[in-house]
Every structure is written in structure tokens, then in C-alpha cells.
Amino acid sequence: MTSPRKTHPLAKIINESFIDLPTPSNISSWWNFGSLLGICLIIQITTGLFLAMHYTPDTSTAFSSVAHITRDVNYGWMIRYMHANGASMFFVCLFLHIGRGLYYGSFLFLKTWNIGIILLLTTMATAFMGYVLPWGQMSFWGATVITNLLSAIPYIGSDLVQWXWGGFSVDKATLTRFFTFHFILPFIIAALATIHLLFLHETGSSNPSGMMSDPDKVMFHPYYTTKDILGLIFLLLSLMSLTLFMPDLLTDPDNYTLANPLNTPPHIKPEWYFLFAYAILRSIPNKLGGVLALVLSILILMVIPVLHFSKQQSMMFRPITQILFWALVADLLTLTWIGGQPVEYPFVTIGQTASIMYFFIIITLMPLFALIENKLFKW
């Protein structure tokens, strides 16, 4: 008799996605991060749900409600810090997942890649709106500065900003709508992640060699479920170490001060995972130019498949492009560092150089060296 997991309409979907899924036998731990992102999303939705039970999205009580969660709610401090640091772990996994996709040529699965970029943008929007909710100084001024960027759009810009704010400044209406969107977006992310998986299972996973792996596949369970559990242990260990020993390591001290529209903090900066994009935004003196560069720094991922001229999918056997890839990683780390520094010499110059290098490596150097490598392989 056939097992119910192979015949039952619901169990069959789970079986084909996580149990009997044919998977290349040579995929490394870099393929772990997809499942870890799923776990991160579950952690964020669960902790967020418990926080929403006690939080009040009102300018007069939001800050004190967060203090109440931290002090009076049973394990409220832990739920809050798990949620805040869980966002950081989410972005660590997200960046490593994208990096793996770039290195091993997974971007050639166009549908999966493009849904992934939409997922990245949605996650960034969710994280930004979540950062506004505690209603501290950095929450308020971060919201003011970033939403104000819409005013750079010609003709309709200022109307668009007021429409988003729900008034003439960031106030009660803004906080309420940000809470609403922050609550609903993770469920949209979960739906998009399902579509992401659906498209991935149409083509099957790539593998480190970049070669076709159809003749050499194994079942996902038990081989990769056990392998993923190891990654999960490291993820939970990192998250709980951060939460229990250094909960405020990645947060801004200014956010422990109640939002005050009359007092601007000396350095307005977003959370660490947005600093690279913030550095690109600041490196262009023109407002519209900065906003365009900011948007393009993410959307450039969409043109990477078009700029792939190499005859090989993966970078595994392409040493010159490997050097460029790690130069790009170093460049992004430099931008992240610069984004957290004040706007003064020499940080401005370093930021501008790193911003130019970011686009130059992706648009010019990588396609150029792919063509050179194609020539070298013919010899």
C-alpha cells in the first residue's frame, strides 16, 4: 500500500517539498541559509505576535508600552530582544543567501531570483517600519529622514510624503499605519517565500560545480534535514547568545530616549543592515541622485543575469571573477562601516569611492572578466 504522505493532498505537497525532494548530492553548507531564513521568519512572526499583544501604536503610549513589555511582562525582555536581534540574524542569513546565489550562479533561475529580490525589498520595508515602532529618538528621526526621500520625486514628491505621513509630519497617523504594515508584511513574506520555493522546485537546486546534477541526486530527507539541523543549532546558539549576553550590541543608545521632534540626534543612522545602502545614498550630494543610487543598489541585482557572459554558471572554476567577488564583499563591508560614520573628511571620500566601486565591479568588471576568462578557457 502507498504511504499516505505520497497520496494525501496536503501531505503530498510537504512530501514533495521537504522529504522526497531530489537534491544534488554535492551541495555545501552554503545551501543551508534558505531553510534558516524560513526558521528566522517563524521566530520573527511568533515573537512579534506576542509583542503585538502588549504594544500600543499610539505616540503618547508606544514608548512606555515597550518599557512595560521589557519590565512587567513575563519574559517580555527576552521576547523583545529575540525579536530585535532576530531581525539582525535574518539579515545575516539573507545577505549570505544572496552572496551564495551570486557566487554559484543561482541567479540564472530567473523566476526564483526575481521573487527573491522582491522578498529582499519586502523584508527591508518590514524591518524599517519595525524600527519606528518603539518611538525612540532614532525611530522618529529615522522615519522622518527616510520617508522624506520620497520628496525627491519630481512634481508629486511633497504630496507623496504627506500622503505617507498622514499629516504634515511623522505623527500618530504614521505610527498607526507603520504598525499595521509591519504586522501584515511578514505574512506576505511567507506567501512570497512559498512562491520562491515553488519556482525553485520547478528547476531544482543549483550546486557548487554549476554542472547539471540530474544523474546524481539524493532525497532531501534524511540527508539534508540533518545537515540543516546543524545550521539551525548554530543559528539558535548565535541568536540566544546575542539576546542573553549582549542584547543591545546592535541597537542605538538614542532609541532609549523618547522621540522628541524638537531635538535632532547628532548622528541619524539606520540599523547596521541598512548602512551599506545609507552610505551610497549619502555619497551623492544631489537628493534625487542619492535616492536613485539607493534604489539601484538593490535593483542592480535584477540585471546580474543579463550581465552574465561567462560560459560557466558557477565561480568555482573562475579564479579572476572570484577575486572580483571578494573585492565586492570587501567593498560592501567598507560601505557598511562608512554608513555608521559622521559626514566629514575622510569618510565622505571613502564612501564615494566605495559607492563608485560597487557599481563599477558589478556593471563593468565582472562582465569584462567573464569574457576574458572565456578566451582563456579556449587556450
UniProtKB/Swiss-Prot annotation:
Q: Where does a ubiquinone bind?
A: H201
Q: Where does heme b b566 bind?
A: H97, H196
Q: Which UniProt keywords apply?
A: Electron transport, Heme, Iron, Membrane, Metal-binding, Mitochondrion, Mitochondrion inner membrane, Respiratory chain, Transmembrane, Transmembrane helix, Transport, Ubiquinone
Q: Source organism's superkingdom?
A: Eukaryota
Biological processes, Gene Ontology terms:
mitochondrial electron transport, ubiquinol to cytochrome c
UniProt feature coiled coil, ranges: none
* Cited SUPFAM superfamilies: a domain/subunit of cytochrome bc1 complex (Ubiquinol-cytochrome c reductase), Transmembrane di-heme cytochromes
Give the result of M78T, as annotated. Answer: In strain: Isolate 02
Similarity comment: Belongs to the cytochrome b family.
Its quaternary organisation is: The cytochrome bc1 complex contains 11 subunits: 3 respiratory subunits (MT-CYB, CYC1 and UQCRFS1), 2 core proteins (UQCRC1 and UQCRC2) and 6 low-molecular weight proteins (UQCRH/QCR6, UQCRB/QCR7, UQCRQ/QCR8, UQCR10/QCR9, UQCR11/QCR10 and a cleavage product of UQCRFS1). This cytochrome bc1 complex then forms a dimer.
Q: What is this protein called?
A: Cytochrome b
Upper classification of the source organism reads: Eukaryota, Metazoa, Chordata, Craniata, Vertebrata
What gene does this protein come from? MT-CYB
